[in-house]
Amino acid sequence: MNQSPPGIIFNIQRFTIHDGPGLRTELFLKGCPLRCEWCSNPESFMPYAQVGVYKTKCISYKKCAACEETCPQENILQFTRGKLTSIERHDCTNCLACHNACPSDAIKLWGKSMSVEECMEEIRKDKGYYERSGGGVTVSGGEPLLQSEFVAKLFQACRSEGIQTCLESSLYVPWKKVQNVLPYTDLIISDIKHMDPEIHKKYTKVSNDKILKNLIKLTAEKRNIILRIPVIPNVNDDMVNIESTADFILNELGGKIRTLQLLSFMRLGEEKYTALGLPYKMKNVKVNRRSFQKHIQMLAEYFNQRGIHCVVGTKEK
């Protein structure tokens, strides 16, 4: 097998059950061209390793100061009441010296370079569980197809060992990158965030045109696809958008999807935004969980009435 560039991975989760069938090992790759306001993984945005600051874990400047002593830049580490609270990101060279010096995990590293074989060593640990549960490997992100060459080689390695593969992708990439991985991909999970290109751009910073075109191409190739809608209050949960989404699935995709999954908005990841010095734009969004779940269930019933197999959550039944 030809050598591929290493993958930049920020998390590997074992025994996941939400992104594909059975028990799975899920790899999360760095880098994403979208900036969805509700994203729970802001550490996935940038395509390189970076650090986050967790001030509650800081020992204190007086007792330690290892980060300050090793940082090659001057005055970019910000301390409040003796504890590290933030980093001036525009002056940071991302050398990771502060993380390497920190003895208390107050400076957390997100992103690690891993070869295909290093990933396979992790994946093989649970091969027996995949076989018994009908599971396998899922690669997510971020946008994993920004590292499509790595994903293709990883999926080739999985296939050679009889391990099922699943790709979770926004599909906001050139079609060529999708084609790179298709021969080795058993299942694709993607989502439709909004049908209106301007509203889509308002909340994700990109248009939906490329995404929808790639979905059409995938269904034309008779690919195994699970579609999702992250249901965000007052963003995409109105009937105008829901009806437009159903029309697209039926008319443009020919209804050729395995399942449509509606995922309820959850306020997750706020602590990570703070650690990265980023604003969390959903901070003031308040949801009555019971009434919102009823609303989502009503939306699922609408899709099912239109002949689209739809469920609430990540299961398929």
UniProtKB/Swiss-Prot annotation:
Disulfide feature: none
Annotated Radical SAM core domain residues: 18-306
Cofactor: [4Fe-4S] cluster
PROSITE patterns linked to this entry: 4FE4S_FER_1 (PS00198), 4FE4S_FER_2 (PS51379), RADICAL_ACTIVATING (PS01087), RADICAL_SAM (PS51918)
InterPro entries, alphabetized: 4Fe4S_Fe-S-bd (IPR017896), 4Fe4S_Fe_S_CS (IPR017900), Aldolase_TIM (IPR013785), BssD/PflA/YjjW (IPR040074), Organic_radical-activating (IPR034457), Organic_radical_activase (IPR012839), Radical_activat_CS (IPR001989), rSAM (IPR007197)
Keyword line: 4Fe-4S, Iron, Iron-sulfur, Metal-binding, Oxidoreductase, Repeat, S-adenosyl-L-methionine
UniProt xrefs under SUPFAM superfamilies: 4Fe-4S ferredoxins, Radical SAM enzymes
Pfam name, any one: Fer4_12
Cofactor remark from the record: Binds 3 [4Fe-4S] clusters. One cluster is coordinated with 3 cysteines and an exchangeable S-adenosyl-L-methionine.
Pathway(s) per entry: Organosulfur degradation; alkanesulfonate degradation
Annotated [4Fe-4S] cluster 1 binding sites: C32, C36, C39
One MF annotation (Gene Ontology) recorded for this entry: metal ion binding
Record NCBIfam families: PFLE_PFLC
Family of this protein: Belongs to the organic radical-activating enzymes family.
Name listed for the protein in its UniProt record: (2S)-3-sulfopropanediol dehydratase activating enzyme
Source organism per UniProt: Klebsiella oxytoca
Lineage: Bacteria, Pseudomonadati, Pseudomonadota, Gammaproteobacteria, Enterobacterales
